[in-house]
């Protein structure tokens, strides 16, 4: 999500902006082992352009995205977790209704933002799987030297 935000802010979503010295254009994405994931992240960035996402909206959406990732072993307090999530959803609603450019269209804007969040679940899952796979591969290739 942060990668899509950086791409939106620094390159108007023309490229994937991992860091100032690591920027992927379409060709670089194709060469990557994670081409499909890059395409997905680029699409999110393009949605940011289409929606003209504000930093405040991005921040609240980022929290909601993080709160949608539940550990495999569950939570210590599901009720507290759900309350926190509900509070951030309320904050997103407030943010959308406050924005003068959204006057009269705040519910449509809220729908677009939550739809974008919902569309990211598969991408987030695939990214986590890719990261875990890459980590496992790096562990398998690790060389242990005798003392």
Curated annotation (Swiss-Prot):
Pfam families: Hormone_recep (PF00104)
Summary of the function given for this chain in its UniProt record: Receptor for both mineralocorticoids (MC) such as aldosterone and glucocorticoids (GC) such as corticosterone or cortisol. Binds to mineralocorticoid response elements (MRE) and transactivates target genes. The effect of MC is to increase ion and water transport and thus raise extracellular fluid volume and blood pressure and lower potassium levels.
Localization in the cell: Cytoplasm; Nucleus
Record keywords: Cytoplasm, DNA-binding, Lipid-binding, Nucleus, Receptor, Steroid-binding, Transcription, Transcription regulation
InterPro entries linked to this entry: NHR-like_dom_sf, Nucl_hrmn_rcpt_lig-bd, Nuclear_hormone_rcpt_NR3
Record PROSITE patterns: NR_LBD
One of the record's GO molecular function terms: DNA binding
Residues at which progesterone binds: 6, 134
Family, similarity comment: Belongs to the nuclear hormone receptor family. NR3 subfamily.
Domain remarks: Composed of three domains: a modulating N-terminal domain, a DNA-binding domain and a C-terminal ligand-binding domain.
Top-level taxonomic group: Eukaryota
UniProt organism field: Gallus gallus
Broad class of where this protein is predominantly found: cytoplasm
Positions bound to 21-hydroxyprogesterone: 6, 134
Domain NR LBD: 1-147
Protein name: Mineralocorticoid receptor
GO terms for cellular component: cytoplasm; nucleus
Positions annotated to bind aldosterone: 6, 134
